[in-house]
């Protein structure tokens, strides 16, 4: 079911020689072309990865199409190229997938994934059912890897879920999820990050229904650059500290990115009662066009179903410090919310939050900026406008 090419054959050896010594020395040992299954292409995809998981190349040919009827889990990949030029269709909505972690997992070290292919999440059935419990489309747990250059459409939930990864570059993604009716796609974050370090996300176009980027628990050393997001919930730190959990996020740089018609622009959100730290977060050269909440820092994040817990723990949250907003420009929406809204906790006030080059045009009904429990707010000009 998997076409398996050995590079020990005489023909393959001649091909390698034709590419020169440099290419031959770095070429993968085997190539596995993913075939179709009679019942579930998840089976043949798994076979291809198993046969080429060490030093191989897995190929989804251009114009090929694959229908998944179960999840795909790959692990222990080492020095693997994934030439993803085809189309993968995720399964139809079924109860068995509710609250699952992912549909496809890529896990290993030194992975290169490219090719211009498409994953179609067929999320409309989930939106129509008001069911926000679908798995993420693609989970990545990869070290020293480069993944990108392909498209995810109609995601039933988060598009990219990155966890337990180090030194990972994500680039040139097109993520496009919209509903064809009034039932909107919920929880369809473009990128969620967990338990990772040294992550770059760049050069991507996003049209989604939730966070453009959500940097969640225990993440550090992140760069987000040259990303355009439409209709999302902004470039977010968090949410963090749910249920009193101890989390951290530090050393994050968002730069040269745009948010258009977004609910939030740049945002830090932590739960009431949470523990831990958020520090050294930098937003530079961000354009916000028609955004409801341009700059938002809150330690009072909560879900309606646990509002009693949040109200009882509202006096403290994570320690938020060294958050810098520089050259944030654009326009606020007609919703009338403040340009700057910093709302921290009495027992864990925010500190060292700075603003420079903030040039966001107000709507006629925009209310005054808010700075609550921000140390040194008397000396912050944005807190008096």
Swiss-Prot record:
InterPro entries: Glyco_hydro_28 (IPR000743), PbH1 (IPR006626), Pectin_lyas_fold (IPR012334), Pectin_lyase_fold/virulence (IPR011050)
PANTHER family: PECTIN LYASE SUPERFAMILY PROTEIN-RELATED, PTHR31736
Enzyme class, first EC level, given as a word: hydrolase
Superkingdom in the source lineage: Eukaryota
Sugar-bearing residue positions: 143, 161, 164, 180, 226, 256, 319, 343, 365
Temperature-related behavior of activity: Optimum temperature is 30 degrees Celsius.
Family per similarity comment: Belongs to the glycosyl hydrolase 28 family.
Protein keywords: Cell wall biogenesis/degradation, Disulfide bond, Glycoprotein, Glycosidase, Hydrolase, Repeat, Secreted, Signal
SMART domains on file: PbH1
Name of the protein: Exopolygalacturonase rpg15
Gene Ontology biological-process annotations: cell wall organization; pectin catabolic process
Intracellular or extracellular location(s): Secreted
Bridged cysteine pairs (disulfide): 212-229, 344-350
pH dependence: Optimum pH is 4.0.
The protein's Enzyme Commission number: 3.2.1.67
Function: Specific in hydrolyzing the terminal glycosidic bond of polygalacturonic acid and oligogalacturonates.
Lineage: Eukaryota, Fungi, Fungi incertae sedis, Mucoromycota, Mucoromycotina
Signal peptide start-end: 1-26
Cellular component, GO, one term: extracellular region
Parts forming coiled coils: none
